[in-house]
């Protein structure tokens, strides 16, 4: 047998070493991040990726070192005057109104379900009664037509020719 030819597609990029990037500027193992680098990738990609991590670490350091500029203003916004309601009371009232609305909605849903159940039970009874009436009507029609048809067929052999003609004319007269 002939050997099956194998095609191997070589990738242009080769996975190289892992590069360690310091995120927070500390020399700890926790702040170090390992990144897979491609050896054949463009130099600008590796420079831009490390540059963005360096920017991130610088921005993080700046944010951690920053302190609020106006401490007095922030403290004055927390403390409310005596005449106004506190934010805690406002939030409690808001939560209570939301809960009241939810319970009202639930009660309305329950009432609608009860009304629908009553309406459904009435409509169900009406549907059952109408089905009974239809069944009784169909049974009585079938009995009368079937019985008449069967008697005609069984006794048609015993009839004379003028009797058969008169039977046919009577049937045609009732069909009009």
Curated annotation (Swiss-Prot):
Gene Ontology terms describing biological process: viral genome replication
Swiss-Prot/TrEMBL keywords: Glycoprotein, Host cytoplasm, Nucleotide-binding, RNA-binding
InterPro entries: Rotavirus_A/C_NSP5, Rotavirus_B_NSP5
Top-rank taxon, per record: Viruses
MF term (GO), any: nucleotide binding
Disulfide partners: none
Pfam families: GBR_NSP5 (PF17580)
Subcellular location: Host cytoplasm
GO CC entries: host cell cytoplasm
Processing after translation: O-glycosylated.
Subunit note: Homodimer. Interacts with VP1. Interacts with VP2. Interacts with NSP2; this interaction leads to up-regulation of NSP5 hyperphosphorylation and formation of virus factories. Interacts with NSP6.
Family: Belongs to the rotavirus NSP5 family.
Role noted for this protein: Plays an essential role in the viral genome replication. Participates, together with NSP2, in the formation of viral factories (viroplasms) which are large inclusions in the host cytoplasm where replication intermediates are assembled and viral RNA replication takes place. Orchestrates the recruitment of viroplasmic proteins such as capsid proteins to these factories.
Protein name: Non-structural protein 5
């Amino acid at each position: 047998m002939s050997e099956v030819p194998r095609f191997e597609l070589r990738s242009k990029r080769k996975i190289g070493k892992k590069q360690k990037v310091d995120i927070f500027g500390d020399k700890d193992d926790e702040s170090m991040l390992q990144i897979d680098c491609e050896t054949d990738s463009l130099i600008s990609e590796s420079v831009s990726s490390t540059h963005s991590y360096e920017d991130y670490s610088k921005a993080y350091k700046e944010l951690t070192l920053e302190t609020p500029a106006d401490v007095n203003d922030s403290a004055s916004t927390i403390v409310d005057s005596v005449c106004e309601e506190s934010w805690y009371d406002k939030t409690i009232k808001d939560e209570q109104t939301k809960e009241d609305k939810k319970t009202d909605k639930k009660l309305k849903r329950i009432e609608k379900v009860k009304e629908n159940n009553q309406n459904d039970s009435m409509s169900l009874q009406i549907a059952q009664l109408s089905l009974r009436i239809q069944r009784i009507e169909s049974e009585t029609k079938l009995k009368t037509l079937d019985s008449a048809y069967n008697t005609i067929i069984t006794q048609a052999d015993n009839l004379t020719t003028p009797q058969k003609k008169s039977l046919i004319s009577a049937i045609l007269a009732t069909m009009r």
